[in-house]
Amino acid sequence: MLKKKINVSVLGATGIVGQNYISLLDNHPWFNVVDVAASKHSSGKKFYDAVKAKWFLKNNIPAKVRDIIVRDVFDFESIPPGVSCVFSAMSLSSKEDTRRLEFEYAQRGFALISNDSANRFTDDVPMIIPEINPHHADVIPIQQKNRSLPSTGFVAVKPNCSIQAYIVVIDALIKAGFKPIEISVTTLQALSGAGKAGLENIDLRENVIPYIQGEEEKTEIEPLKIFGSVSKKGIKNFTDLKISALCTRVPVIDGHTAIVSLNFLNDSLN
């Protein structure tokens, strides 16, 4: 356990992903939430007042953050002193705007860990699953040099939520000496993955939607970056694997399912 917890900020704290961040970080052994930020619509309110009518989780709003005043995500001057790490669940109107916002925090010396997809395909931004590719953090000095960032500032991202369970198994097979060359995956993704709008859409509750915009591209490309290698210019994608994906939205509140088939280089796994 750390002698002193790391003070953190949560961006997009009033949304579904942000609420999960707040819940997961409550009483965390490493992190202490001292700042929450969101859009202008929520800024200036106590966190409790901003989320009480739309709190998604079954557990109560953590007491430690209830009275924190929500900061506008663009109000950098109001970030409390001592904050060194930022967890971002913020999605702006365009991916380019989100990319700029994330690097603005990095430029100001903050380590920003993003849940958004805006920077997942940025070559010098690591997309890390700790059990698989912690060494991709080695690209951070390259990112800092490329973008003239201070020594404490960088952007790192997590991958798409629907791939996180099965990709760990695929990684274990690769490390055990097996060589998958083709992967076919069908995802059954919960309504919560579409945010508040997905949960409130009555039509979605009784239907299976056979297409989710952008999800198939993420599912097919993100694992190649995770299995990739660090080069002098950034992350070089793994090239010896072909992934084909079909992503569907199903009437389940929370929790994704994936049906995965693999073809291996050798006919036998013995």
Please name every model-derived segment:
Residues 1-210, 242, 266:
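N-terminal Rossmann-like NAD(P) cofactor-binding subdomain of oxidoreductases
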Residues 179, 191-270:
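Charged docking surfaces used in two-component/phosphorelay signaling
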